[in-house]
């Protein structure tokens, strides 16, 4: 039986921390779906389609195997998506105890609703302070985001800023 896991996130934009979690999760599961989700509580900097395209490029540039794919989910419960693709695990990156506190109730509900387990991965310490919201703030103020994002993302943001 194939072990399929989903790494959900808004990825607005995808960071080196995200890539670290994706890379490590890809080694743990037979198939990994990086799921770009619409979060109704957030106003995205990048449209959903652009985020999907950027993550696809980042995954390709990182040389990750074909067992890693990207998809998007516009609305609904993550466990419904998991059922559709046969996934039994959600993988989340957690940077701090605050992230663990935030993720715990959702993990318990996901397990209750669909018998989907949540695996929390700690980041590489080099990326533990990086978040998409931090990158958006630095970008909005004209700062250099290259230490925090893959090259394809830095390039796309530079083009966007110039454009």
UniProtKB/Swiss-Prot annotation:
The record marks 18 as: Transition state stabilizer. Pfam families: CTP_transf_like. GO terms for biological process: coenzyme A biosynthetic process. GO terms for molecular function: ATP binding; pantetheine-phosphate adenylyltransferase activity. Its cofactor is Mg(2+). Pathway: Cofactor biosynthesis; coenzyme A biosynthesis; CoA from (R)-pantothenate: step 4/5. It is found in: Cytoplasm. It catalyses: (R)-4'-phosphopantetheine + ATP + H(+) = 3'-dephospho-CoA + diphosphate. Substrate binds at residues 10, 42, 78, 92. Keywords: ATP-binding, Coenzyme A biosynthesis, Cytoplasm, Magnesium, Nucleotide-binding, Nucleotidyltransferase, Transferase. GO terms for cellular component: cytoplasm. ATP binds at residues 10-11, 18, 93-95, 103, 127-133. HAMAP family: PPAT_bact (MF_00151). Belongs to the bacterial CoaD family. This is Phosphopantetheine adenylyltransferase. It comes from Clavibacter michiganensis subsp. michiganensis (strain NCPPB 382).
């Amino acid at each position: 039986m194939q072990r399929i896991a989903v790494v959900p996130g808004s990825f607005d934009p995808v960071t080196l921390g995200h890539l670290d979690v994706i890379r490590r999760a890809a080694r743990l599961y037979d198939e990994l779906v990086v799921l770009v989700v619409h979060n109704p509580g957030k106003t995205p900097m990048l449209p959903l389609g652009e985020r999907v395209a950027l993550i696809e490029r980042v995954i390709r540039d990182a040389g990750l195997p074909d067992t890693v794919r990207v998809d998007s989910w516009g609305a609904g419960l993550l466990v419904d998506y998991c059922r559709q693709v046969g996934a039994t695990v959600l993988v989340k990156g957690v940077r701090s105890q605050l992230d663990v506190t935030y993720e715990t109730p959702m993990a318990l509900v996901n397990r209750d609703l669909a018998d989907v387990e949540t695996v929390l991965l700690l980041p590489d310490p080099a990326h533990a302070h990086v978040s998409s919201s931090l990158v958006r703030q630095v970008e909005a103020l004209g700062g250099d985001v290259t230490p925090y994002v893959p090259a394809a993302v830095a390039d796309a943001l530079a083009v966007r800023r110039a454009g």
